[in-house]
């Protein structure tokens, strides 16, 4: 062997040895914390993530659920030299999510701030981890979610939901398969664009296809970017290019919409006190528009994707719950009858629909959880956790544990009935505390209007072969597109022709 090759081999062995020593030392602080065996020394638990069987409808949160059941309320997770801790006790959820002392962990939110080198959510309201900077934004944007502002949005909710139902009624022959995932996504996008930014996207009418495709590619890119090796794999180059182009396209859409609003303001036109108005105010005095575009992308994506998936999961589950559907139809008939416009007051009277939507979020939360940074060593549920550790809190995991919910895999809206005990710090689909979702009331009103109109006018049946599993594309969504055949309410098959 030549001296050069010998030297190179020695250098590689030395580097490998140093890497192993570094990984071992980094993990040694956590070895006392319960957790599953690592299938790989260097990769840690990463191979477990790859084997989660998304083809069968299992997602990463199902792996964490298995570990929480087996190892208790504090579970160690190793990936390379990094360690996170899954926490699943109500006491700890209350302690860490309800206090302003514990911030989001910036390392865990980098996957949203930039994706494959392109700025996506940046320092927007979801991904900003510095409390002071986040609070400055939140205080201004909160004004767009006042009660009076939300009530004024009922017109938009009704308009777009009515448009959806009319399109579906035209396909309601009991035979034509319809992707409810797609239709509900277009509806949520149209609602969000008009309510938040004063723009008409007309997704339901087949317009803006490049925009919907860009959103789809971007969401797939967020998930793909979690594989730290993805950017180095030759087979991923096309996807990386498409994801980057999609992100640039989305931010350009934001620039165009912002420019239109600024021009309207210059002309002295009256503009709504919507989200766009408030994020313009929040970024007054900024040197450039990048922070403003961060919040545009944040609200445009988070504001429609979670609602669309919530609706799709609900339709999927109701397709196998005829007794629950019958109760819902009876309530809708009593509260709104045949009228086409739902009033704000009607929403509060749809009690059982509220229960169904909450139960859907328990089993199928599109936003599965959140992270907090533990800065100092702390005793958590009797286990010493070192400082500078990311803590993971999952409403998906806790919502499916029989420790907190009896028969947790059964869809039972009565868990949220008026006389039922409230789940305390075991159910947080909109997070909790100061970092809870700013748009949760908006989302709850929106999905209630859409579901009420669907139940009022249509019956839906899942096409045979559709699976009830999940997949992850930044958020959790149904594994299949929720293909349904539709019929008008009260539809009866035509009688057979009389004999000749």
From Swiss-Prot:
Domain of life: Eukaryota
Gene Ontology biological process terms in this record: bile acid biosynthetic process; cholesterol catabolic process; nervous system development; progesterone metabolic process; protein localization to membrane raft; regulation of long-term synaptic potentiation; sterol metabolic process; xenobiotic metabolic process
Residues binding heme: 437
SUPFAM superfamilies (UniProt xref): Cytochrome P450
Gene Ontology MF terms in the entry: cholesterol 24-hydroxylase activity; heme binding; iron ion binding; steroid hydroxylase activity; testosterone 16-beta-hydroxylase activity; testosterone 6-beta-hydroxylase activity
Disulfide cross-links: none
InterPro entries on file: CYP46A1 (IPR039983), Cyt_P450 (IPR001128), Cyt_P450_CS (IPR017972), Cyt_P450_E_grp-I (IPR002401), Cyt_P450_sf (IPR036396)
Pfam families xref list: p450
Name this polypeptide is given: Cholesterol 24-hydroxylase
Lineage of source species: Eukaryota, Metazoa, Chordata, Craniata, Vertebrata
């Amino acid at each position: 062997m030549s001296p050069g090759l010998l030297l190179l081999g020695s250098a590689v062995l030395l580097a490998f040895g140093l890497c192993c020593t570094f990984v071992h030392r980094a993990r040694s602080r956590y070895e006392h914390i319960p957790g599953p065996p690592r299938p790989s020394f260097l990769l840690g638990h990463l191979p477990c993530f790859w084997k989660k069987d998304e083809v069968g409808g299992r997602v990463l949160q199902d792996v964490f659920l298995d570990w929480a059941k087996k190892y208790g309320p504090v579970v160690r997770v190793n990936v390379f030299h990094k360690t996170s801790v899954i926490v699943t006790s109500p006491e700890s959820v209350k302690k860490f999510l309800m206090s302003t002392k514990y911030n989001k962990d910036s390392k865990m939110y980098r996957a949203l701030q930039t994706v494959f080198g392109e700025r996506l959510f940046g320092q927007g309201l979801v991904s900003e981890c510095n409390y002071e900077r986040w609070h400055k934004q939140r205080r201004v944007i909160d004004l767009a979610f006042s009660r009076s502002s939300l009530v004024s949005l009922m017109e938009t909710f009704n308009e777009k939901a009515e448009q959806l139902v009319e399109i579906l009624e035209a396909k309601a022959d009991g035979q034509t398969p319809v992707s409810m995932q797609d239709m509900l996504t277009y509806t949520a996008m149209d609602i969000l664009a008009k309510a938040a930014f004063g723009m008409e996207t007309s997704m339901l009418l087949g317009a803006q296809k490049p925009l919907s495709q860009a959103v789809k590619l971007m969401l797939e890119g967020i998930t793909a970017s979690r594989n730290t090796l993805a950017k180095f794999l030759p087979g991923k180059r096309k996807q990386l290019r498409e994801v980057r182009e999609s992100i640039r396209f989305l931010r350009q859409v934001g620039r165009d919409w912002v420019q239109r609003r600024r021009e309207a303001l210059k002309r002295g036109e009256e503009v709504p006190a919507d989200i766009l108005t408030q994020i313009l105010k929040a970024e007054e005095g900024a040197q450039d528009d990048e922070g403003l575009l961060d919040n545009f992308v944040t609200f445009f994506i988070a504001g429609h994707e979670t609602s669309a998936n919530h609706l799709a999961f609900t339709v999927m589950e109701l397709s196998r719950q005829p007794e629950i559907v019958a109760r819902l139809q009876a309530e809708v008939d009593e509260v709104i009858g045949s009228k086409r416009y739902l009033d704000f007051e009607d929403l509060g009277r749809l009690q059982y629909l509220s229960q169904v939507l909450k139960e859907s979020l328990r089993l199928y939360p599109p936003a599965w959880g959140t992270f907090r940074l533990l800065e100092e060593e702390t005793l958590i549920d009797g286990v010493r956790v070192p400082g500078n550790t990311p803590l993971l809190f999952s409403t998906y995991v806790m919502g499916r544990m029989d420790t907190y919910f009896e028969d947790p895999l059964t869809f039972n809206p009565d868990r949220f009935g008026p006389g039922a005990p409230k789940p305390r710090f075991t159910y947080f689909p909109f997070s909790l505390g100061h970092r809870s979702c700013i748009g949760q009331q908006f989302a709850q009103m929106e999905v209630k209007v859409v579901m009420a109109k669907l139940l009022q006018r249509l019956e839906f049946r899942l096409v045979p072969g559709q699976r009830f599993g999940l997949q992850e594309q930044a958020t959790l969504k149904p594994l299949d597109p929720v293909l349904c055949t539709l019929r008008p309410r009260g539809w009866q098959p035509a009688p057979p022709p009389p004999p000749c």
